[in-house]
Amino acid sequence: MRYKFKTQEDLVNHLKSVGFVFANSEIYNGLANAWDYGPLGVLLKNNLKNLWWKEFVTKQKNIVGLDSAIILNPLVWKASGHLDNFSDPLIDCKSCKTRYRADKLIESFNKDIHIAENSTNEEFMKVLNDHKIFCPTCKQFNWTDIRHFNLMFKTHQGVIEDPKNIVYLRPETAQGIFVNFKNVQRSMRLHLPFGIAQIGKSFRNEITPGNFIFRTREFEQMEIEFFLKEEIAYDVFDKYLNQIQNWLVTCCGLDLNNLRKHEHPKEELSHYSKKTIDFEYNFLHGFSELYGIAYRTNYDLSVHMNLSKKDLTYFDEETKQKYIPHVIEPSVGVERLLYAILTEATFIEKLANDEDRILMNLKYDLAPYKIAVMPLVNKLKEKAEAVYNKILDLNISVTFDNSGSIGKRYRRQDAIGTIYCITIDYDSFGDEHDPTFTIRERNTMAQKRIKLSELSLYLSQKAHEDFQKQCQK
């Protein structure tokens, strides 16, 4: 019998205790809603980014990569609209001093109330008054006026804090792609349709960050700007919709029952979008946005072309026409997807002997360690280390664990997602050149004795079996 952690706090405490995440600046009482990634978190995060890149870039014939700077010319943000419009409606409860985003306050009261992204302060207040929306914290109806708060982090470039030297930490990675559109297209001799992919840090001075790593002020994005003719935009949109759903389930291990699609009604669409669909995941705090696909039309290239006075059109050699390409944008936050995967994979299992174990059911490609090597007793440590070193040479992510009883070591590895535990015992070295060992599978706890020379084939066969099972679901 398996059951999930009851609260977000329980899950976070487990992840902190085993080295996935730590509270930022913890020895100084932390920094609100900021997190550092520990040794296991780094491995999992890198595995996730590599898995995404492999699926959406490496395996595609018309996608290339880019790594643009975090600090861009401020005119980029002027053209994109971020300087003037990238803000949240801020409201405070006068009674308890709790601060909210007005749109999220309304949404948490009733998700069926649709508020346009560009709603005025007066329109927000009208909804609050009409529905008599009380403060969730103190249950009072005592609001300040709404004011807008720009989400971009402002700093200065150079030694003098002069208004002329103001720059911003990028709030999204997309604009770095758009301003490099022509550079990439020319240098790589690309023909439409093609995409530019990027993984990178973004920064938003969120009014109400929270829910662990779901919404933080510093985060990482994985996204593609796919440039194409307008006529095929909706077909490509649907292609990405299907590909992303399949990848989330098959490669990331998310349960399809915990995913749902939300198409933004017209009044909720961003100013640049003609169509947006979000995959929402059932987090411990409820369904929330996980992975978005937006049809950005030719808005971004058009505004940059207008302000920069540079030609960002594409010349179609077949039709002999010049036009501004349209764009489909699939985008996901690394931390948000990481949180969904950890929520899905981590649970408590009641065993036949009435003992509980924490099990992190991560996919093979995501697991921080594929194998843990363990000597049965400490006097076999040296021989176990020899096997460990040989597995390292196979380019497999492996850890060495010789602390505590063998049962405790199994439980420890189960709780961090290690796929296999290899135990070196007294029968392991009948053949010094090709030692044998028991290999224990995480989910089933089934054990089998194999030779070191058989390990690569064994892992390949197990991976194929797991893939076949997934395809049959």
Swiss-Prot record:
Its main location: cytoplasm. GO terms for biological process: glycyl-tRNA aminoacylation. This is Glycine--tRNA ligase. GO terms for molecular function: ATP binding; glycine-tRNA ligase activity; protein dimerization activity. Homodimer. It holds the Pfam family tRNA-synt_2b. Keywords: Aminoacyl-tRNA synthetase, ATP-binding, Cytoplasm, Ligase, Nucleotide-binding, Protein biosynthesis. GO terms for cellular component: cytoplasm. It is an enzyme of class 6 (ligase). InterPro entries: aa-tRNA-synt_IIb (IPR002314), aa-tRNA-synth_II (IPR006195), aa-tRNA-synth_II/BPL/LPL (IPR045864), Anticodon-bd (IPR004154), Anticodon-bd_dom_sf (IPR036621), Gly-tRNA_synthase/POLG2 (IPR027031), Gly_tRNA_ligase_bac (IPR022961), GlyRS-like_core (IPR033731). Belongs to the class-II aminoacyl-tRNA synthetase family. Substrate binds at residues 101, 172, 219-223, 329-333. It catalyses: tRNA(Gly) + glycine + ATP = glycyl-tRNA(Gly) + AMP + diphosphate. It comes from the Bacteria. It is found in: Cytoplasm. Its EC number is 6.1.1.14. Coiled coil: none annotated. It comes from Ureaplasma parvum serovar 3 (strain ATCC 700970). ATP binds at residues 204-206, 214-219, 289-290, 333-336.
